A protein has these predicted regions:
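Active-site pocket-lining/capping segments in soluble small-molecule metabolic enzymes
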Residues: 2-182, 192-335
Length: 335
């Protein structure tokens, strides 16, 4: 019987007994990425606690530079109002103004999702939406913004608050060009708006990403990387309109809105979500390698959806995309 051979173990594959520090806590493939998170008015307490715990344990401030969301007011769009209704704004003694100020003091901008696809001139005097707008604009924080779809609302806000940044909502690019968006179309948006949320289908359009990269304007775009909708969904625009219709028709004065489950409403069979009917199809959620590919084209701002997601889902996305994988990601759920 031959003696057993001893196999040399390479120590460079063993984990260190000390955690990374500084930027070492971030995903090593995308270290300069900054993030825009769907937590405003929904996951505020959880995000504040997470940021504070991370700073205490790792002496590092995570690169979350913006949050987005909105109460269920008439101008809101993109998502239904389930979570907004579940979390009243005074649940911790906070008002919208206090929350925005807390974010701004942390170096985090706030973006309202004023992305209703069906607004007309007659909706511009909505008191609840204007109330929120006035609060946001009065903070005079350069990172605050509104995400818009309808030109009439964009023009109205630009006239009232010319210094308030505007972002192009995914709802707008879906409404304008529901099936395929061109580089020329995106260029036209860059001429009018400060920032553009890149349609999640377009994260996989390598020719378009290269054109944007070559234009030198990648810093104006914010790709959405964890969109759970079916890739190339053919009824996305119908879903957005259904949500918007529910917002407009569900208003009962100030912040009193009825809630509509637009995905499963039997009277609207044309807008039943393909995720339910065809679960075998891939979603727009990017793999880590796909995320790195977008990053390598020069994009540095990235969006995490979260307005209709539980907090655990947001933590999962932090651990998947933002954090270092060997040491830090697995600790995310312990903070």
């Amino acid at each position: 019987m031959e003696p057993k051979k001893h196999v040399a173990i390479s120590t460079d594959k063993l984990k260190s007994n000390r955690l990374p520090t500084g930027k070492g806590v971030l995903n090593k493939d995308t270290p300069d990425a900054v993030y825009d998170v769907g937590s405003l008015f929904i996951h505020d307490k959880q995000l504040f606690n997470f940021l504070d715990a991370f700073k205490t344990l790792h002496d590092y401030v995570l690169p979350i530079k913006s949050v987005f969301g909105c109460y269920g007011v008439k101008w809101m769009g993109g998502r239904n109002t389930n979570y907004q209704q579940m979390v009243p704004w005074n649940h911790q003694g906070w008002t919208p103004e206090v929350l925005i100020q807390e974010y701004n003091q942390r170096g985090i901008g706030c973006t309202y999702t004023f992305s209703n696809t069906l607004l007309t001139e007659k909706d511009l005097d909505d008191p609840s939406s204007n109330y929120l707008l006035d609060i946001l604009a009065s903070q005079n924080y350069s990172g605050n913004a509104v995400a818009v779809t309808q030109d009439c609302l964009s023009d109205y806000i630009r006239k009232r608050y010319p210094d308030l940044k505007q972002k192009v909502s995914v709802c707008k690019s879906t409404k304008d060009m529901p099936h395929k968006r061109t580089f020329e179309y995106y260029e036209s948006l860059c001429d009018k708006f400060e920032l553009v949320y890149l349609h999640p289908d377009d994260n996989l359009n390598l020719k378009l990403l290269e054109q944007i990269s070559d234009s030198g304007k990648a810093e104006k775009y914010i790709p959405l990387i964890n969109e759970r909708c079916t890739w190339n969904c053919q009824i996305r625009n119908n879903h957005y309109d259904e949500t918007s219709k529910a917002q407009i028709e569900g208003w009962h004065g100030m912040f009193n809105f009825s809630n509509v489950d637009f995905i499963h409403t039997p009277s609207h069979p044309k807008t039943i979500c393909p995720r339910i009917l065809m679960p075998h199809l891939r979603t727009c959620v990017l793999s880590r390698s796909e995320f790195k590919r977008v990053y390598d084209f020069g994009f540095r701002r990235f969006k995490f959806q979260g307005r209709d997601s539980p907090w655990a889902s947001i933590l999962y996305n932090f651990s998947t995309y933002m954090l270092e994988q060997d040491y830090i990601a697995e600790k995310t759920f312990t903070y």
